[in-house]
């Protein structure tokens, strides 16, 4: 009996207690691009939040690297937040933003496959093992705390080995998103066998137009766009607050990574000037697949009251996430950014059409030549030499 209780520790299923955490207000709550009216849609809000995959500290998994830690308690919170953001992208990719999880009901096979990407085993492509060991290539020792930018770089590199989800991961640099580079990456990486990879972007675009409306979609690799930012020096500059909140309203929103120094949260929305977040700082026991090949998912959804914090208490180091399944989604995102973000006198980030001339040439990332495939390749830190270290992002002018 004690083992059963331990398995489901920290799970609170009394919905009334959950909803009492929200004030009685006419204000809208925004969660990852969807709005909820508290007075009339509290149960829908609850369902929407609890449907997000929730990754927390775990214990009793196999030692990382064979001899490393068997728990990430105290150091893995930003890695868990990165997992949550990526998992939301995969849910949108395979099941759609409107899909909802229901407790103790059979879930789609795609859902189970997504969940298994994140189990705490070295053979799972986005496990704590893979992320921690890939972090060595970013200058982070196993067991060391990661910042938002480091997690973004790790996800970008691990995604190269994930053939099933087939994501193009773009991490902006110098607070600048380059439209030309993203379209080059997403189109090039998903070309059909009869389309030469070396064809220029203009030629590819013309070819797609001649083939009809469906060709453009089939030539687009789903995009995970991560924008690391520093919105101040020691604290967030209030001038960025409105633009930051606007990002949670965008249909492409995957929320934000951030929190406080050495204390990471996954921000999924806001109410007024309070950010709503999922907190990874709960230590649960490692969950593995069962005999039927599925994993018990009851501890991977947060049924506790959602936590909130005033946006001005946020550490200025953050990373915004967006998912664009099709090219039209990215085009729509660009329009929203131009309308809501670039209108500010002090812009949170820049969106430019062309690759800056003073930057090195853009080369779409490619999987290194290694002797194994998939997640198994990162069995030791020596195999990380194929990757170049990424520089940290710059501080925005304030």
Curated annotation (Swiss-Prot):
One GO location term (cellular component): cytoplasm
Active site (UniProt): 77 (nucleophile), 279, 281
Any one Gene Ontology molecular-function term assigned to this protein's record: cysteine-type peptidase activity
Enzyme class: hydrolase
Motif LIR per record, residues: 393-396
Keyword DNA damage recorded: no
GO biological process, one term: mitophagy
Cellular localization per UniProt: Cytoplasm
Protein's UniProt keywords contain Transferase: no
Listed EC numbers: 3.4.22.-
Superkingdom: Eukaryota
Catalytic activity: [protein]-C-terminal L-amino acid-glycyl-phosphatidylethanolamide + H2O = [protein]-C-terminal L-amino acid-glycine + a 1,2-diacyl-sn-glycero-3-phosphoethanolamine
Keywords carried by this UniProt record: Autophagy, Cytoplasm, Hydrolase, Lipid metabolism, Protease, Protein transport, Thiol protease, Transport, Ubl conjugation pathway
InterPro entries in UniProt: ATG4_LIR, Papain-like_cys_pep_sf, Peptidase_C54, Peptidase_C54_cat
Pfam families tied to this protein: ATG4_LIR, Peptidase_C54
Activity regulation (UniProt): Inhibited by N-ethylmaleimide. Redox-regulated during autophagy since reducing conditions activate ATG4A whereas an oxidizing environment such as the presence of H(2)O(2) inhibits its activity.
Quaternary state and interactors: Interacts with ATG9A; the interaction is direct.
Function: Cysteine protease that plays a key role in autophagy by mediating both proteolytic activation and delipidation of ATG8 family proteins. The protease activity is required for proteolytic activation of ATG8 family proteins: cleaves the C-terminal amino acid of ATG8 proteins to reveal a C-terminal glycine. Exposure of the glycine at the C-terminus is essential for ATG8 proteins conjugation to phosphatidylethanolamine (PE) and insertion to membranes, which is necessary for autophagy. Preferred substrate is GABARAPL2 followed by MAP1LC3A and GABARAP.
Family under the similarity heading: Belongs to the peptidase C54 family.
Domain-level remarks: The LIR motif (LC3-interacting region) is required for the interaction with the ATG8 family proteins. Required for proteolytic activation and delipidation of ATG8 proteins.
Protein name stated in the entry: Cysteine protease ATG4A
Organism of provenance: Bos taurus (Bovine)
């Amino acid at each position: 009996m004690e083992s059963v209780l331990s398995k489901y520790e920290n799970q609170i299923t009394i919905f009334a207690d959950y909803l009492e955490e929200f004030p009685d207000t006419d204000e809208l709550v925004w969660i990852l691009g969807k709005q909820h009216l508290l007075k009339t849609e509290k149960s829908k809000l609850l369902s929407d939040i609890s449907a997000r995959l929730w990754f927390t500290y775990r214990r009793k998994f196999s030692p990382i690297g064979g001899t490393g830690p068997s728990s990430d308690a105290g150091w893995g919170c930003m890695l868990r937040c990165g997992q949550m953001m990526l998992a939301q992208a995969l849910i949108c990719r395979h099941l759609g933003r409107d899909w909802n999880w229901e407790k103790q009901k059979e879930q789609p096979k795609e859902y189970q496959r997504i969940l298994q990407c994140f189990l705490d085993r070295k053979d799972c492509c986005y496990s704590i093992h893979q992320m921690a060991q890939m972090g060595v290539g970013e200058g982070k020792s196993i067991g060391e705390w990661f910042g938002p930018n480091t997690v973004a770089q790790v996800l970008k590199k691990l995604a190269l080995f994930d053939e099933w989800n087939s994501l193009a991961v773009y991490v902006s640099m110098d607070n600048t998103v380059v439209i030309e580079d993203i379209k080059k990456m997403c189109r090039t990486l998903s070309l059909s066998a009869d389309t030469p990879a070396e064809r220029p972007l203009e030629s590819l675009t013309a070819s797609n137009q001649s083939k009809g409306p469906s060709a453009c979609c089939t030539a687009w690799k789903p995009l995970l766009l991560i924008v690391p930012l520093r919105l101040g020096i020691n604290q967030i500059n209030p001038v960025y607050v409105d633009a930051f909140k606007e990002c949670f309203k965008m249909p492409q929103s995957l929320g934000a990574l951030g929190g406080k120094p050495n204390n990471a949260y996954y921000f999924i929305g806001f109410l007024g000037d309070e950010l709503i977040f999922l907190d990874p700082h709960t230590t649960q026991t490692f969950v593995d697949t069962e005999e039927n090949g599925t994993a018990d998912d009851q501890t991977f959804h947060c049924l506790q009251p959602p936590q909130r914090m005033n946006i001005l208490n946020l550490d200025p180091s953050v990373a915004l996430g967006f998912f664009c399944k099709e090219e039209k989604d990215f085009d729509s995102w660009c329009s929203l950014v131009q309308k809501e973000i670039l209108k500010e006198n002090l812009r949170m980030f820049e969106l430019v059409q062309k690759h800056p001339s003073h930057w090195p040439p853009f080369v779409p990332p490619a999987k290194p030549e290694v002797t194994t495939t998939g997640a198994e390749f990162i069995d030791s830190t020596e195999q990380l030499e194929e990757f170049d270290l990424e520089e940290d992002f710059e501080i925005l002018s304030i």
